[in-house]
């Protein structure tokens, strides 16, 4: 490894190639605006939970080309004035973003980058890499939390995560989505997350006996959660846990037992009965074993007696949808006269047509009910709070419309960097979690459903929509050589 290694080259080669084109053509400092967004709700959910901003900030603050970066690029064939430009690179971007914990929706900008064209191009890959992963994990955690409600969710996925960075930042994202704590000690240290550890089957196997293993553990640790399913949960494991808890008395804090296999719905009811009959009515039952929101929902339908949920593989890997699919598109570019020109990306797939222009997303909230009525996308500089009513309509199915009055409009995109200088103070992680929960409570129940949620409105202001339609027509006419279809 290089002692001066940086994350600046955490990018795709074609970003560097395009930077070189812009530089050689003398347009690298033209002002540009790019916006990141995703096209479909993850997990067929009604919302997504935005995460990743802290790492984006850390990445951008340290954006520079080190000596070893320059040497490596030179080995790839880059040379001359372009390398000199990279040596003197100074981050000058203006960045606006949703806040971590914000609920975000398909086809609205969640990160907006403005500044020199070449710099905007460089950061695409890293920004998407961060947002695509962390938003996915935060959303998965929020789905699980929506099912278990006030019961604790513990993140147990480190060993199944896609490498160490994914484990650390995935844990943090899971906490934003609602996890109460983690088994990951390093994540606990870095982000001040509560940590919880029980023990593995190996401890019982080493002693060859549940009672001896639990007794040894209790003599070492005051807070005890015993894993009771190594050999036989109901006939060996739970009785041994009860015996040790009785013998140790006040010398330990008997928190409960963990079940990691078998018919959890049936076994948990029997374990609850055994603990209650032994007088340990306050002892909790912890469950793990490839759980996710769907399994937990099923267990709850069977009235399983679980108090704490340990979720690992299917949370930290976003098991049922491994990619969010966020994209990063240019929406405006400075022309030769110094004026900003809106740009659009067309496609035969309607969902892949981008929205042109630098925009702002407004969360429209009913003053009477305190609930979110939808998101309204305007051009930047418009203050929706100056309006007395908003006519919202679906950007594709325009006959779906409604008029909203007596509302508050809250801008989603806030200033993070201005001309390369950080202007946003990063909040503490648990404050972000509390904020996410507050935002979740503003959603109507129809949008919160884990299964078949209602579609949350994300609508364009009429002028934005009309300009989009006009640009589509212009580009189609250009493709046809000016002929009418």
Describe the residue ranges of each PLM region.
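N-terminal, Lys/Arg-enriched amphipathic/low-complexity engagement segments
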Residues: 30-88
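Short coil/turn segments at secondary-structure boundaries
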Residues: 71-72, 139-143, 157, 448-455
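Short amphipathic alpha-helical segments
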Residues: 52-53, 136, 428-432
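Short, positively charged
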Residues: 75-83, 163, 389-397
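A residue-level signal for beta-strand positions that form part of recognition/binding surfaces
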Residues: 33-35, 92, 153, 327, ...
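Gly/Ser/Thr/Ala-enriched C-terminal appendages of enzymes
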Residues: 1-30, 44-45, 291-485
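Buried, small/hydrophobic-residue-enriched core segments of structured protein domains
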Residues: 1-31, 40-42, 77, 83-92, ...
């Amino acid at each position: 490894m290089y002692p001066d290694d940086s994350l600046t080259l955490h990018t795709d080669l074609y970003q560097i190639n395009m930077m070189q084109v812009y530089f050689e053509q003398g347009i690298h400092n033209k002002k540009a605006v790019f916006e990141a967004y995703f096209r479909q709700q993850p997990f067929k959910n009604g919302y997504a939970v935005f995460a990743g901003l802290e790492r984006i900030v850390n990445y951008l603050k340290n954006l520079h080309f080190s000596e070893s970066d320059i040497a490596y690029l030179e080995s790839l064939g880059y040379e001359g004035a372009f390398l000199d430009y990279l040596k003197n690179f100074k981050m000058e971007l203006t960045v606006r973003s949703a806040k971590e914990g914000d609920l975000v929706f398909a086809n609205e900008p969640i990160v907006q980058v403005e500044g020199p064209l070449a710099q905007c191009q460089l950061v695409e890959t890293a920004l998407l890499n961060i947002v695509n992963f962390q938003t996915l994990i935060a959303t998965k955690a929020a789905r699980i939390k929506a099912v278990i409600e006030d019961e604790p969710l513990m993140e147990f996925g480190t060993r199944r995560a896609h490498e160490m960075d994914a484990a650390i930042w995935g844990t943090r994202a899971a906490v934003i989505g609602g996890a109460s704590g983690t088994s990951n000690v390093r994540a606990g240290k870095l982000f001040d997350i509560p940590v919880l550890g029980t023990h593995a089957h190996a401890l019982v196997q080493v002693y060859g006996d549940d009672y001896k293993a639990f007794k040894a553990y209790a003599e070492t640790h005051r807070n005890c959660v015993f894993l009771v399913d190594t050999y036989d949960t109901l006939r060996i494991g739970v009785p041994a846990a009860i015996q040790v808890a009785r013998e140790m008395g006040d010398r330990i804090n008997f928190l409960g037992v963990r079940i990691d296999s078998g018919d959890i719905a049936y076994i948990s009811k029997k374990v609850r009965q055994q603990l209650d009959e032994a007088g340990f009515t306050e002892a909790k039952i912890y469950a793990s074993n490839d759980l996710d929101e769907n399994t937990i929902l099923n267990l709850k339908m069977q009235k399983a007696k679980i108090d704490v949920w340990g979720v690992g593989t299917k949370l930290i890997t976003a098991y049922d949808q491994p990619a969010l699919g966020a994209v990063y598109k240019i929406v405006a570019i400075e022309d030769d006269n110094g004026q900003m020109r809106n740009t659009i990306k067309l496609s035969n797939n309607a969902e892949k047509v981008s929205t042109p222009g630098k925009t702002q997303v407004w969360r429209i909230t009913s003053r009477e009910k305190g609930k979110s009525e939808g998101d309204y996308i305007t051009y930047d500089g418009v203050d929706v709070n100056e309006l007395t009513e908003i006519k919202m309509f679906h950007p594709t199915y325009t006959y779906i419309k409604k008029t909203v009055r007596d509302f508050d409009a809250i801008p989603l995109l806030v200033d993070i960097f201005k001309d390369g200088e950080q202007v946003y103070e990063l909040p503490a992680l648990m404050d972000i979690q509390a904020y996410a929960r507050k935002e979740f409570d503003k959603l109507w129940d129809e949008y919160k459903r884990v299964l078949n949620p209602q579609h949350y409105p994300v609508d364009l202001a009429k002028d934005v929509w009309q300009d989009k339609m006009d640009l589509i027509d212009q580009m189609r006419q250009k493709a046809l050589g000016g002929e009418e279809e």
